[in-house]
Amino acid sequence: MLQAPNPASRADQTLSHNMKLLAHHELAGFGGLGEGMSMQMTSDGRRILWLAHESAPKNFSGVDVTDPSNPKLIVQTELPHMKLRSNSLDVVGDIMVVAYQASTVGI
């Protein structure tokens, strides 16, 4: 039976028999992610992985994964206040849609 991966896993460790961890990114310490995840192929050929954050203060992050073994954080945005979270997101072409959830009605 396979054990749950250790958060400090190294790229050279085998976590599964049919998959290999290529890299890990700490997202500047804001790794609490929601369901929102989308891959974008840019006009210049880069692959950007967009990630929604589960809780404030971060809204979403963009990670350049063109070289999957060397991911680069290229943008990380802030929510307008602590009572929101970015539940999910999607990207089509150059347009991103983010769904927010509020902890208080009417914000």
Residue ranges, per PLM feature:
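Feature marking well-ordered beta-strand scaffolds used for ligand recognition
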Residues: 1-107
